[in-house]
Amino acid sequence: MENIGRQRPIGVFDSGIGGLTNVRALMERLPMENIIYFGDTARVPYGTKSKATIENFSMQIVDFLLEHDVKAMVIACNTIAAVAGQKIRQKTGNMPVLDVISAGAKAALATTRNNKIGIIATNTTVNSNAYARAIHRNNPDTLVRTQAAPLLVPLVEEGWLEHEVTRLTVCEYLKPLLADGIDTLVLGCTHFPLLKPLIGREAHNVALVDSAITTAEETARVLAQEGLLNTDNNNPDYRFYVSDIPLKFRTIGERFLGRTMEQIEMVSLG
């Protein structure tokens, strides 16, 4: 019976497809885990919506994942984590719920040497102040500098990961953070890990915190602690659910995932 509990999937969700960077990190860190992903591609972006709407949409996704009997959830969306994280945890009770902001903040604090941390994220995540709050909860003396970097999202989706336009945009966004002397930079949007090589070159001597990797690490730690790690599954099942299959979805999705997406199914929520 205990083994059946361990075989249950991890549920990962996002407002769109960026959260597939989290799925990729989970596949690499926990290769025996079954994973269900839900991307709300019909209603993306969440960043421009009200708190009540984001909470409402998030609850619908949580219900969907609970119906699929997941053993843990990963909020692979900075906006949802910032706005609806608390409500989601209230609903799921004792189930482990991980999120990119908590994991990213924790990793940034463990990485910084001079206590100056930069965050690049979308407008909503920056305006929510969620990263600064999570960091200051653990260390109130840390200087946290945030920079909204909304133009990077469409550039990543276009596949311009090494394009000169992207490089110039990154440089522009990094200027104020580097001027403040940060030694650690959190990639606070699920699209940004794809720009890690480029950002690393433009922000040399700055440690990059990839919240997809740190969330996967945290998931592994919590599952082990709860006795939920799947250690007996050489053929994991990966399922991808979306609320719409927009143009180029598979192409962009496979770029994020770093492999082919076989089981994509469309479902409507709400």
UniProtKB/Swiss-Prot annotation:
Metabolic or biological pathway: Cell wall biogenesis; peptidoglycan biosynthesis
Residues at the catalytic site: 77, 189
Catalytic activity: L-glutamate = D-glutamate
One of the protein's GO biological processes: peptidoglycan biosynthetic process
Enzyme Commission code(s) on record: 5.1.1.3
Pfam families found in the cross-reference section: Asp_Glu_race
Residues where substrate binds: 14-15, 46-47, 78-79, 190-191
Keywords, comma-separated and alphabetical: Cell shape, Cell wall biogenesis/degradation, Isomerase, Peptidoglycan synthesis
GO molecular function annotations of the record: glutamate racemase activity
Keyword Isomerase: yes
InterPro entries: Asp/Glu/hydantoin_racemase, Asp/Glu_race, Asp/Glu_racemase_AS_2, Glu_race
Function summary: Provides the (R)-glutamate required for cell wall biosynthesis.
UniProt cross-references to HAMAP family, sorted A to Z: Glu_racemase
Similarity annotation: Belongs to the aspartate/glutamate racemases family.
UniProt protein name: Glutamate racemase
The species this protein was found in: Neisseria meningitidis serogroup C / serotype 2a (strain ATCC 700532 / DSM 15464 / FAM18)
Gene: murI
